[in-house]
Amino acid sequence: GYPQPATQRPAAAPMSGARTRYWIEINGTRHQISRATLVLGRSTDADVRIDDPGVSRRHCEIRTGTPSTIQDLGSTNGIVVDGQHTTRATLRDGSRIVVGSTTVIYRQAEG
């Protein structure tokens, strides 16, 4: 009674039709990311507005994909991702992004 490995579907195979969902959490508020790119900043033009004097008008951009990345858009104070001061980083589920004095949590999930 040994299982036949050839007949088992690999556990890592994504379910058909499952899409990865992306969102960020700022101060407990969830912001769905529905486009390929999301600009965070203090400006009303930003996709997600962060009302923080340490945040530039167009501070940084999150680009979803495999992998998702974040890019500093020439902000005054830069970005810190998972404790590293950087201009560009790869994001994973649970990444902590600090812009100004605001912490943004990046989240992604299948389906």
Feature locations, PLM:
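Low-complexity, Pro/Ser/Thr/Gly/Ala-rich intrinsically disordered linkers and tails that serve as
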Residues: 1-22, 111
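A short, polar/charged loop/turn motif at coil->beta-strand junctions and beta-hairpin connectors
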Residues: 18-20, 27, 34
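Forkhead-associated
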Residues: 29-108
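Short polybasic amphipathic segments
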Residues: 20-24, 77-79
